[in-house]
Amino acid sequence: MNKRSVIIAGIVASLLGLALGANFYFMYYLSAEEGHLASVRALENMIRHKMRHLKPNYLNRNPRFFMFRNKLLKNYKAAPYENASVLWDIANWWPHENEVYPLYDSSMGQLLETLRREPITRVSNLGRGTQLKLLVRLSHQQKVIFKPQWYPREEVIDGMIYSGKDRHTAEVYAFYLGAVLDFRWTPIVVGRVVNLKKEIYAKGDPELQQTINIETDEDGREKYCLFGKCHYCNEEETVCGDERHNIEGVLIYIVPGTLAKRRSPWQRTYKDDKRAPWEDDMTYCKSLKNKMETIRLLDLIDASIFDYLIQNGDRHHYETREERVVLIDNGKAFGNPNKDHLDILAPLYQCCLLRKSTWDRLQVFSGGVLTEIIDRLSKQDALYPLITDKHKKGVERRLLVVYAVVEHCMDIEGDKMFKTL
């Protein structure tokens, strides 16, 4: 073979290699109209690649964290109070659009103590919904919702992402996570140990009392067990007090104002043999961008990051207050610390949009400090520790995934993916 033939053969081989490489690239990325990946599996492969090559700033502590940490610790520190009625008024005055409470307010520490300490004056069943909840009145007729404990902290919930009953401490953790990430769209929540006999049964209305079974053993000791009233409530599944009739639970401050319930565009089918369109269509968001206001879409993308971190895959509907998304009902989080359901992030990786303020805030809590600050904030709660170490590791692992997904979107959209709405 002469020199010219060798050169030609080399050029042909190079072109063939480029063609095959390009073909692989476009099959893998499926530039499909806007450069979206072909499937969730392709996305997962890309995320793994991104996570192996994350920039050091995502793995190390952000120097700005310490300023945020000090402000948060000061704001949420338990504080004594004198007049609960005044604090109820302040909390009812706080909400603006979907912001349930202000970024910083000296009354927050007092309000949390008020929720922990004010006496229960009346209790009734809150029949709506699928989960057991009670409507509790505290002093000055302030209404709150009570959710009881169903599982010990370390129990792993197997099955689908939405399996099992509510995890009570997830509601408290969601409150602190929202405060830290500036998603102040959750209700204010505290943990509280209540006496099923003296505070629930004795203060309950006749209908509630009928949903509490009282058993007496051979030694004359009573056992109180609550089954309540809801869609799935029944006498075979009860919450029982300990030897002193105490049960763990959470008190959830009812968000003032009118809330509208809306179906999520990323709703699951809840059927094993049927998938929703968004689960297979990586360009699903394209049509939504033409139908939905950008501010609403950005709210839902923020919500998806919030839900992904705690693994709440049950937001089939969402609530709005003054046309802005609020994060009500966060109890289906922290089911299995070893699983990360990436599809909860579908709004982010399908739309490749994100608020600039959200992205800036997420980066403040890099390097393992997100769970550290929430742990410190929640030490004053009656139910501390709220989650296990395995769940904490899961939160930090998922934050790295969020960083990787945003990096992937930046490869496609550049800085134009960030919005200031």
From Swiss-Prot:
Residues annotated as binding Mn(2+): D166, D329
UniProt-annotated glycosylation sites, renumbered to this chain: N83
Chain positions recorded as ATP binding sites: Q131, K147, I252, Y253, I254, V255, E319, D329
Enzyme Commission code(s) on record: 2.7.1.-
InterPro entries: FAM20, FAM20_C
Pfam family of the protein (one): Fam20C
Keyword Disulfide bond: yes
Domain of life of the organism encoding this protein: Eukaryota
Enzyme active site: D314
Keywords of this entry: ATP-binding, Disulfide bond, Endoplasmic reticulum, Glycoprotein, Golgi apparatus, Kinase, Manganese, Metal-binding, Nucleotide-binding, Signal, Transferase
A Gene Ontology cellular-component term: Golgi apparatus
Catalytic activity: 3-O-(beta-D-galactosyl-(1->3)-beta-D-galactosyl-(1->4)-beta-D-xylosyl)-L-seryl-[protein] + ATP = 3-O-(beta-D-galactosyl-(1->3)-beta-D-galactosyl-(1->4)-beta-D-2-O-phosphoxylosyl)-L-seryl-[protein] + ADP + H(+)
Single GO MF descriptor: phosphotransferase activity, alcohol group as acceptor
Family stated for the protein in its record: Belongs to the FAM20 family.
Protein name, as recorded: Glycosaminoglycan xylosylkinase homolog
Organism expressing this protein natively: Drosophila melanogaster
